[in-house]
Amino acid sequence: MAKFDVYDLSKKKVGELDLADAVFAGEVNEHLFYEVVKAKLASDRSGTHAVKNRSLVSGGGKKPWKQKHTGRARQGSTRASQWVGGGKAMGPKPRDYSYDVPKKVRKAALRSALALRSKDQKLVIVQEWKPGAPKTAAAAKVLSALGAKKALVVDDAANLALAKSVRNLHGSDFLAVEGLNVYDILRHDALVLTADTAKKLEASLS
């Protein structure tokens, strides 16, 4: 088990938390980051690119001139791809770029990302963070005290006050623990977890 310091919102140590080495202090595998982030970015692509082929371009139903005895090259339609205003030959069509990464790979990548933040001393665990009302200035002050600027804050989805407080901060974001992913961990410089959230991650990733 790895020991982690637990802080209050002013970064005063209030206790320690034992967490599984396999989840928070394992080996960092950067190739897993590549695989999972590539899949995530691929799934984010809209895939709506399209051009009109000759069947979609309006007009061109009539043969422009007779087949023979004109001295010109034979043509069947003014909307063929070699004509100005014609359809595009073999152009892009809408497609779905997403593909699945095995669940074991996704879990291993997430464990590796948590271990990376722990190794870099960019993982901060707080006892709890439950503001009474959304206050962006207060959230900024807390993150500054924790030394966690451009941070990803993770807690229960029900903590709406915290989510609204953090989302207006430039470079920082809030994620529900169920939605934690490798891409967002790597995209932020620091990771802030509550003690309960850390325990939930340990249980789900062990």
Swiss-Prot record:
Residues 63-72 have a biased composition (Basic residues). One of its GO terms (biological process) is translation. Keywords: Ribonucleoprotein, Ribosomal protein, RNA-binding, rRNA-binding. GO terms for cellular component: ribonucleoprotein complex; ribosome. Residues 48-97 are annotated as: Disordered. InterPro entries: Ribosomal_uL4 (IPR002136), Ribosomal_uL4-like (IPR013005), Ribosomal_uL4_dom_sf (IPR023574). GO terms for molecular function: rRNA binding; structural constituent of ribosome. SUPFAM superfamilies: Ribosomal protein L4 (SSF52166). Part of the 50S ribosomal subunit. PANTHER family: 50S RIBOSOMAL PROTEIN L4 (PTHR10746), LARGE RIBOSOMAL SUBUNIT PROTEIN UL4M (PTHR10746:SF6). NCBIfam families: rplD_bact. One of the primary rRNA binding proteins, this protein initially binds near the 5'-end of the 23S rRNA. It is important during the early stages of 50S assembly. It makes multiple contacts with different domains of the 23S rRNA in the assembled 50S subunit and ribosome. Forms part of the polypeptide exit tunnel. Belongs to the universal ribosomal protein uL4 family. This is Large ribosomal subunit protein uL4. It comes from Anaeromyxobacter dehalogenans (strain 2CP-1 / ATCC BAA-258). The gene is rplD.
